[in-house]
Every structure is written in structure tokens, then in C-alpha cells.
């Protein structure tokens, strides 16, 4: 009814992409207060729903036994390390952008203790739990459906209940929305606003970021998972690692952890 689509994607997929893009921009235009509200309730909601999915996977796969009995796909440690090391580097690159711009969020902390706990305890713990649940669910799909399903959209398509599908898709939207805005929009929006404060506001910076995001054609990156991980993520992690090294050396060695607060706000 909507045509055959273009660039390898259906018309409905393009409409979904544009609607989601517009939702991101709308939240940014409402400011940091709405963003903070979204982040505060999105994380526990997604955690609860993912835990429910883990419970389903555990029951459908008849417990942990079949999951732990699965054999490794690697013949030896040499083949394992060839995949593990670049994959680990890719994940470091994935989080490098947020780590460099963490002050965009920690500045709202009411004390050093709050931001320290958030970065050293809360963030690593929640990411480990989410990653572990993702591995568990994907492993369970191998037992349940005979093949690993890592894409939550494809997994949801296996369900029969319209209610379950609706709740699951809403959870996917909330999870993607909260992560995308916090990790990919806030920091560059602040960068544009701070670079040209007379001409660009935070809202305008968010709009510029959204336009650049479309021009980068992210659907091409995701079309090839191997290229996305081993070329894109591993490639730019080297550049961001260098920037991170400069920031660490400047703060700990050059400035001895002492900053002039007035200099931080000069434009």
C-alpha cells in the first residue's frame, strides 16, 4: 500500500525511522528537564521488562542446563582471541564518545560523591547486567528456535500475542530513545552551542546533530555488522582514545586535579 521502498528498506521502515528521529528532536527541544525525566523512568522500566524476557527465556529453554551445555563455536583459544580483542576494542569505541563527554551529565550531580558513585558503581553494574541478560536471551533462542536471535525486533516477531508484541516494541522504543539521546545527541548539541554561543543554542545544536546523523546514513553502517564493529567502531576508537589520553594527562599530571572554575565557563 505504501510502495516498495528504496535504498534497501521498505517505506514503513523509513517512516518509522523519521518518526523516531522526530521524537528525539522533540525531546531535545523540550530541554534537559524532560530528558532527565525520561532517563529516570526509562532505565528501571527497561530493566524490569528485560528481566521478564529473561524469565521467559529460562522457562522456554527448560532452565540453565541446555544453555550451559552449548559447545563453543571456537576451535581453540587462538581463534577466540582473534574475535574477542577487536570486539572488546569495538565496545571501548562504542562507549568512548560518552566517556569523553561525561561532564555533560555529571555537572548536574550535587556532590563529587554522587558523580563518583554513578560512574564507578551504577553505570558499570547496569551495563554488565544488561549485557549478561542479552547474552542469556540470545543463547536461549538457540535452544528454543534452533538459531541465535540477537535482534530484539526479530525475536518479538516470533511472539503470537498482540499485547506482548505491543509491550515489547514499546520497551524497545523506550530503551533506544533513552540511550540515543543521552549518548549521541546531548554532547554534540552542547559542543555546537559552546562553540558558537551567539548563534547556536542547545536546541539548535540538537537539530544540527539530528541532521548530521541523517547525512551520515547510519543504515549503511548497520547493513554490515562486521564492518560496523571491526571497521567503524575499532577505527574511530583509536582517535577518541588519543583525545581521552590528552584529557587524562592534562587533569592528573599537568593541572594536578586543580581547575580554575572561571576558565571552564569562558567562551
Labelled PLM ranges:
Residues 45-72, 94, 134-143, 245-257:
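Hydrophobic alpha-helical segments and their helix-loop junctions in multi-pass secondary transporters
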Residues 1-18, 25, 29-32, 60-85, ...:
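Inter-helical loop and helix-membrane interface segments of multi-pass membrane transporters/permeases
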